[in-house]
Amino acid sequence: MIHFATRDERLRQFFGAYFNQDWELDDPDVPSVVDRYARDYEGDELDGESVIGLLVKDLRWLVETNKEIPSTDLWNITFDEYGSYYTGEFTGEDAHQWLQWVARRLENHLNKQ
């Protein structure tokens, strides 16, 4: 598996590859997408740190650095900058809370390793 060294590369890989325009054809729901990423990168390391753990930090960074902006703007960032075709905007999901949920779900996978 290719490992991406920078935060932006990892976020683009996660959102662009796993939440691409056809994500609903690959997986039945959002938890399944996140779980597939965790399976794909289970045990992988970059410079001695878990690839999944790095993404957890990246997701938390994304939330923290954008905590003052509206949820709609954060959904737009995940699309415009990172290539995500998932948005909970139409179901009323808050982007900040959703990203934290994704980070927690990935962290749970780490704790099982």
Protein language model regions, located:
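Short alpha-helix boundary/capping elements
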Residues: 19, 23, 63-70, 79-90
